[in-house]
Amino acid sequence: MPELLIELFSEEIPARMQARAAQDLQKLVTNGLVEAGITYAGARAYATPRRLTLVVSDMLAASAPVREERKGPKADAPEKAIEGFLRSTGLGREQLETRETPKGDVLFAVIEKPGRPAAEIVAEVLETTIRNFPWPKSMRWGSSSLRWVRPLHRILCLIRDEEGAEIVPLTVDGITAGDVTEGHRFLAPGEIKVHGFEDYETKLRRAKVILDAEERAEHIWADATNQAFAQGLEVVEDRRLLSEVAGLVEFPVPLMGEIDADFLDLPPEVLQTSMKEHQKFFSVRDLKSGKIVRFVTVANTETTDHGATILAGNRKVLSARLADAKFFWENDLRIARAGMQPWREALENVTFHNKLGSQAARIARIADLAATLAPQVGADPDAARTAAELAKADLSSEMVFEFPELQGLMGRYYAEAAGHPAEIAAVAQDHYQPLGPSDAVPTAPLSIAVALADKLDTLTGFWAIDEKPTGSKDPFALRRAALGVIRIVLENGLRLPLINSVKHHNSENTSRPLFSALVAHAKTDQERADGSKSMSDWKALVARSQDDLLSFFHDRLKVFLRDEGIRHDIIDACLAMEGNDDLLLLVNRARALSETLKTEDGENLLQGFKRANNILTQAEEADGVEYSYGADPKFAETDEERALFAALDTAEAVIDPALEAEDFAAATAAMASLRAPLDAFFEAVQVNAENQILRRNRLNLLSRIRATCLKLADLTRIEG
């Protein structure tokens, strides 16, 4: 079956756009072919700096004929109605068929469309694709009306079958499709005629072009790591940089060079960031010292001097860049060693948000909240306050101004230079974590206190000014902040009720972080000269906001637990219980219940509970009373009743102390033990007996079962 080969050859495509462009080319062309009746077995797209390539294998040589029937008006319909139908079908009156139907004679149009050759369809689809290609940015050149990311020079478009290769007849803005491509710009310039994809790929490789970006990346990494290994060094892994560099070259030649000794004492992260951001260099690390001592650059050509001239030029440019970094570092160190006060004062003039004040005001709120939270997480309040006050000082430093991605990390270096203990200095770096779902969370008590305070201040602040996430829009990353709080609390095993003081082992130290943070925003507003809310307004806002924000946390928690395989209805059942602002308590309850309901006993007990609850609810509605006065074993008539009484006594003796100790696994296991006696009870006993004493006693027994089960979670909310 035929194979389609397309290449769009242009000036250099930005590396960041190549992968998406290849995907778009494949999607647009293949979708267009399928819509026109041309199916295929497989397709793959490629990208290099100068070309987008698509190969479609085993496609149809032509589209199938299409026969379409369209029902029209009645045969005796007004002439205007018939004329309108003729216009819509493109047929004449004599071409219509008259058919008998239950509603009389009706006109039908039979439209037959012959199949079309693949070349004709490909030409239409490719021209549409080129003219409507979704580049993030595009340009026009010369007198052309065509827009492309960079000037488009050639279109290669071939259909190859058993009889040979055929050029698809296509011209787009003066560029006529052909069977010619070009090799490497420097190593193999000139035209190359091809006859199909295999021939195309082979000739390009011979012309120093590696078509597959993944293969280029593998070649870069293998060559770079081998060069480093030969000198007892290692290349710092950076997959994003590797992908980007693979998009900058068609024939990668990794070269390893030296960094001038003047710069080797810079922090490794500074060297790595400067080389990556400015030069697209890989960093090479000394395994013993951990210092960055070499760099790897990737050339797009081979040279007779084995890259010596290229390395010399790159080293010269790199030295100029690193001289700037060294200047920033030395200036920052002088300020850090003097106590960082100028930086902290400068933050008074840096706006965090026009409705939430300056960075300095925010830091003051975070420091207060961190000190409040410190006892809850095992940290010293004074140390937490100090750490919070220093954590963001580096935002005013020259190094962070140049490289914003180093915020926090540089703060740790500067805090250490100022003479602060390592645990306080580490907070500057750790309190931003986690930045993503795979990032580690802070584990040191001081870092936990400040990280929680930072994220809670952000959340409560934006809730206070009604700037909440909506749909897919979350410009202030509030969902990430909430997930960060959830992960810090859960992964560190923290008992930290967000709103209510819930009785637990450390109840005397319980704080209310959401409430405290919201009140801090109220005070901040009152202290500003333009504060538009009275304190009574703020109190009402605090009450509303903390409940709404807690619901937001619960929504984020559902997403988090869903990834663990815990169903949303199980979480809802646990959310209905007291203490639902204690995230660890809530999750432990949900995990235990989820595991129990996965067992046969747990699932059957749930059905038994629902049956008991339904019978009891119907009886209470019919009788207008609540059956919760306690069942008496002396009125039990059957062995099954007596067995259920005994099983309840045994289970409650375990469940109540287990719940008090928050041992939900033991509580759910004891609850599941009721399954067999409850099943036997329903099999042998008629609850709504004619004897009213027996009936009331049995309903009270069901009420006791319901109450026992509801101590763990609101099982009425569980589906199934």
From Swiss-Prot:
GO terms for cellular component: cytosol. It is an enzyme of class 6 (ligase). Pfam families: DALR_1, tRNA_synt_2f. One of its GO terms (molecular function) is ATP binding. It comes from the Bacteria. Its main location: cytoplasm. It is found in: Cytoplasm. It catalyses: tRNA(Gly) + glycine + ATP = glycyl-tRNA(Gly) + AMP + diphosphate. Keywords: Aminoacyl-tRNA synthetase, ATP-binding, Cytoplasm, Ligase, Nucleotide-binding, Protein biosynthesis. This is Glycine--tRNA ligase beta subunit.
